[in-house]
Amino acid sequence: MLLAIDIGNTNVTLGLVHGEAIIASRRAATRATSTPDELELLIDGLLHLDGASFSDVTGISVASVVPALTGVTLAVAERRSLQLLEASSATMPMPIRVDRPSEVGADRLVNALAVGRLYGTPAIVVDFGTATKFDCVARDGAYVGGAIAPGLELGVEALAVRTARLPRIELKEPERAIGTDTTSAMQSGVVIGYRALTVGLLDRIKLELGRTEKVDLEEIQVVLTGGLSAGPWARGLLGVDAIDPELTLKGLTILWALANGSPAVADSPTVGWAGSAAGSIHIISERDK
């Protein structure tokens, strides 16, 4: 089975993949100082929660935005004699039309790959994580950029840490915009205000993408993902076609399948390009030692 790993600033998310289907997923807090031993123990423990072990894993597909943990994951793969595919601008089987492709986060590229294959193009992915990321995919499947805003929980934390009297609050949908105490006022500002930020930026991005791609705005697929995408603040957004919390794991699965020549994935009709990343990926196996 394939082990898909999404290493974010807040969480490490694992997906256990059989064939091309995610059969289990787990999430743990990110520790940027983890050693190979610690990460191996974490992964092994999460696998055991679903009755699996490292002996069931045939390869690892990883997207990491934490450079320190990228190398640690590589060390774990070497130790376990597993093939490892690291998502990056160099391993993406799609055009990346931005000024500096190497600066684009691996998770953003993987999401762009997944949305094109699974939902069609043109498309916008909104990823609710530590940061909220908006990523655009052109009609031909190319990644063409996006926007990054502070994440919802980051805003809550900043209010608590950077002010003298504002408390940490629970993220919940307020009953009204006009709060009658500090907590309800903060919930209004954070949740309703955050939704307004998302909708406003999404509308502007959709308008620009529609103009560039010469399509009606209704043709642009909008997909939400990320650890906070299942919250009430996300469900209340207008103009969203799908909420897919496992989009990144699915993208890592697709990337692996393409790199290994899966006919089912390579023949996907949803975008204007097809092909394999084989030959450009960083693979570690027993033969390389």
Question: What is the meaning of each model-derived region?
Answer:
Residues 54-65, 83-84, 213-227:
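Short glycine-rich phosphate-binding loop at a beta-alpha junction
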Residues 2-6, 59-61, 123-127, 221-223:
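Short glycine-aspartate micro-motif
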Residues 47-52, 56-78:
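Phosphate-bearing ligand-interacting subdomains
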Residues 74, 81-162, 191-206:
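Phosphate-binding/catalytic loop of phosphoryl-transfer enzymes
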Residues 2-45, 142-167, 173-176, 184:
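Short glycine-rich, Thr/Ser-proximal phosphate-binding strand/loop in the N-terminal lobe
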Residues 2-4, 30, 158-289:
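ATP-binding/phosphotransfer module of carbohydrate and carboxylate kinases, centering on a glycine-rich
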Residues 38-50, 197, 201-202:
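Short, well-ordered amphipathic alpha-helical segments that serve as non-catalytic structural scaffolds
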Residues 68, 90-91, 226-230:
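Short, polar loop motifs at secondary-structure junctions
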